[in-house]
Amino acid sequence: MTKLIVGLGNPGEEHEEDRHNAGFWFVDALAKQLGVRFESEKRFHGKVAKAKWEGEDLFLLKPSTYMNLSGQSVGALCRFHKIMPADILVVQDELDIKPGSARLKLGGGTGGHNGLKDIQAHLSTPNYWRLRLGIGHPRDIAGDGRPMDVADYVLRRPQLTEQKLINTSIENGLNILSLFLKGDTQTAMMELHSKG
């Protein structure tokens, strides 16, 4: 069964270190681990890497469409390779989870995440897997009583201490990926969620 792991982010050097690109960081780390490279694929509106996982095809995708149009890329690749929504894992940044924590779930709402909204529209279902990497909320981090604009926050690089925590959650996500891809999603969730 062909699987797809999508990292969400914004293309371009100016966004490489933004919190909003945590999904890209995850699939970049996975590609390195698997020894594969991303290649630009215009027909899929993104960069694609193809690997084998226990004899099955595994695609990694970084949409080049900007976050809010990610569904265009995901939909094109899924239609071409006949990948079902339940075989998709979308890796995203999550404001409502503290840095260092990650959560795995199937389906659910978009939580205001425009990338997820667009993917859901293109797949015509919310029933795909999400790996939510905590980046924290600006109200928790500002500390000076003044609210920080969410859009401004996600488009900035994290502080060094936050980055280390996000990197830990990426490692934790990579560590449960084997369980997830084998279909042992309950154990994968328990292991990941026990990390914090």
From Swiss-Prot:
EC annotation from Swiss-Prot or TrEMBL: 3.1.1.29
GO-annotated cellular components: cytoplasm
SUPFAM superfamilies cross-referenced by the UniProt entry: Peptidyl-tRNA hydrolase-like (SSF53178)
BP term (GO), one: protein quality control for misfolded or incompletely synthesized proteins
Primary residence: cytoplasm
Compartment(s): Cytoplasm
Alphabetic keyword roster: Cytoplasm, Hydrolase, RNA-binding, tRNA-binding
Family: Belongs to the PTH family.
Protein name in the entry: Peptidyl-tRNA hydrolase
Species per Swiss-Prot/TrEMBL record: Polynucleobacter necessarius subsp. necessarius (strain STIR1)
Gene designation: pth
